[in-house]
Amino acid sequence: MSAFVYMLRCKDDSLYTGWTNNLEHRLAMHKAGKGAKYTRGRGPLTLAYVEELSDQESALKREYAIKQLPRSMKLKLCSSWQKQNTEK
């Protein structure tokens, strides 16, 4: 079963990183204010990055790795992802 690592850009321009098995459902939860405590009250939220991985373990490891990156590297990941997804 695949899993996803994602980043959300919050209204205050901060980035939230998380993982899920069901991306659409998780995004709906965040937008409804029922996601992570960090994102509550920081809307509107926009999807800034998504990476699909083969399983939960891989997603958790990747989420941790992304969270360790400096903000500048996170922004580069987001920029690269957005370029790839606007060209399609």
Q: Residue ranges of each PLM-predicted region?
A:
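GIY-YIG nuclease catalytic motif and its immediate N-terminal context
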Residues: 1-74, 78-88
